[in-house]
Amino acid sequence: MKVVHTVGKRRTAIARATAKEGSGKIRINKKPLELMEPKYIKMKLMEPVILAGEALSNIDVDIDVKGGGIVSQMDATRTALGKAIVEFTGKMDLKEKFLSYDRTLLVSDARRTEPHKPSKSSKGPRAKRQKSYR
């Protein structure tokens, strides 16, 4: 039985996906994808599923996601799901389809928050006192 493990990251959210042979079920934190709320999150998570089409009919994907907020978790989950589908099927045309649609389906977003600097640390990394000319 073929099993594939993939990881998707976005800011502090980390999603770990496990793909194995099955009947096309996708579960996120042990909840079916169809029950995800709000609707915007569900629709964004459905994108790789719709793009994959019939290639997903014999794959079960379980995703565990931790950290971050709901949007970061959604982005990390999309990346992990996209990687799992491509790696499990091994189809290059599917990989090209994902990359042409949205690169973040296969590549994690490397941007992170900027660390605060020592001067006005609570105000942010680039905070300065306002300069007055009069």
From Swiss-Prot:
GO terms for molecular function: RNA binding; structural constituent of ribosome. One of its GO terms (biological process) is maturation of SSU-rRNA from tricistronic rRNA transcript (SSU-rRNA, 5.8S rRNA, LSU-rRNA). The keyword Ribonucleoprotein applies. Residues 109-134 are annotated as: Disordered. One of its GO terms (cellular component) is cytosolic small ribosomal subunit. InterPro entries: Ribosomal_Su5_D2-typ_SF, Ribosomal_uS9, Ribosomal_uS9_archaeal, Ribosomal_uS9_CS, Ribsml_uS5_D2-typ_fold_subgr. Transmembrane segments: none annotated. Gene3D superfamilies: 3.30.230.10. Keywords: Ribonucleoprotein, Ribosomal protein. Residues 118-134 have a biased composition (Basic residues). It holds the Pfam family Ribosomal_S9. NCBIfam families: PRK00474.1 (NF001749), uS9_arch (TIGR03627). HAMAP family: Ribosomal_uS9_A (MF_00532_A). Belongs to the universal ribosomal protein uS9 family. This is Small ribosomal subunit protein uS9. The gene is rps9.
